Amino acid sequence: MLSPKKTKFRKQFKGRIHGTSKGGTLLNFGSYGLKAVEPERITARQIEAARRAITRQMKRQGRVWIRIFPDVPVTGKPAEVRMGKGKGAVDYWAARVAPGRIMFEIDGVPDDIAREALRLGAAKLPIRTRVVTRIDAGVAQEA
């Protein structure tokens, strides 16, 4: 599962996801991509589940690029522990995803397989998504 090797601080504030994605909104590697439509934190487990679903549908042909990385530590306190006594330990890592962000890109498979693979990958994610395709160089179009 994805997680940072080293961070400046062990714990972070929760934060909010405001507005649309500032970068990562165009296809850079593949011919098809999965674009976020709403803001959400995506956990490392969800990213891995989506990657596996996409790879399985593609029957290990072509190539998959993961364009998001879980760099936000999410903490939690154990069950039946009273409030206070500091912030809990890091439970898992998440990626903040804003609307418009390309999360996955794929290439090297036929159109119908690519769309089905991304649809199955999107089912593993907690947000609404849209499949985008490369019409001309560097431009993501709604599919």
Curated annotation (Swiss-Prot):
Report the domain of life of the source organism: Bacteria
**GO molecular function list:** rRNA binding; structural constituent of ribosome; tRNA binding
* GO BP annotations, alphabetical order: translation
Q: Which InterPro entries match?
A: Ribosomal_uL16, Ribosomal_uL16_bact-type, Ribosomal_uL16_CS, Ribosomal_uL16_dom, Ribosomal_uL16_sf
**A Pfam family matched in the record:** Ribosomal_L16
Taken from the UniProt entry, a GO cellular component term is:
cytosolic large ribosomal subunit
Q: Which UniProt keywords apply?
A: Ribonucleoprotein, Ribosomal protein, RNA-binding, rRNA-binding, tRNA-binding
SUPFAM superfamilies xrefs: Ribosomal protein L16p/L10e (SSF54686)
Instruction: Fetch the PROSITE patterns from UniProt.
Output: RIBOSOMAL_L16_1, RIBOSOMAL_L16_2
Q: What is known about what this protein does?
A: Binds 23S rRNA and is also seen to make contacts with the A and possibly P site tRNAs.
Q: How does it assemble?
A: Part of the 50S ribosomal subunit.
Family, per entry: Belongs to the universal ribosomal protein uL16 family.
Q: What is this protein called?
A: Large ribosomal subunit protein uL16
Task: State the species of origin.
Answer: Caulobacter vibrioides (strain NA1000 / CB15N) (Caulobacter crescentus)
